[in-house]
Amino acid sequence: MINKFSQFLVEEEKVVYFTFGRMNPPTIGHGKLLDVLAAKAGRNPHKVFLSQSQDSKKNPLSYSDKIKSVRKMFPKHARNIMISKNVKNAMDILSTLYGQGFRKVAMVVGSDRVIEFETLLNKYNGKEARHGFYNFMDIKVISAGERDPDAEGVEGMSASKQ
């Protein structure tokens, strides 16, 4: 039985691509990530979700300031940067996307985070939990490229280095 109208709107053939990050503050490395996200998505929808964490040491920008900064630094991706006060982590994102009717999802992250997110996102697929519920037909975690924290330039850039 179908309980919600959104269940009629299943996007079975489309894969929604997304990324999730602190981007606090945004860097050239984040710009590379957004470019790779858009390229991997092609004609499929893609979305950028930012964490809401804030503290004086590692996360100086508020959520709203971070949204403004990322949109200003990367204007060609501005429309894909989502504002969602309900999204606190990657599982919240998947629950949201599942609720929007998507059944295939691909997360694009730095190479150092692929295994972590593959394990985490698949662990909760099909399970009701604090984040809500999602049951995707396919969950992929794709590397945006190598990230070497010791490297110079784009490959080594992170907000923590600033």
Locations of regions flagged by a protein language model:
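Nucleotidyltransferase catalytic core that binds NTPs
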Residues: 2-161
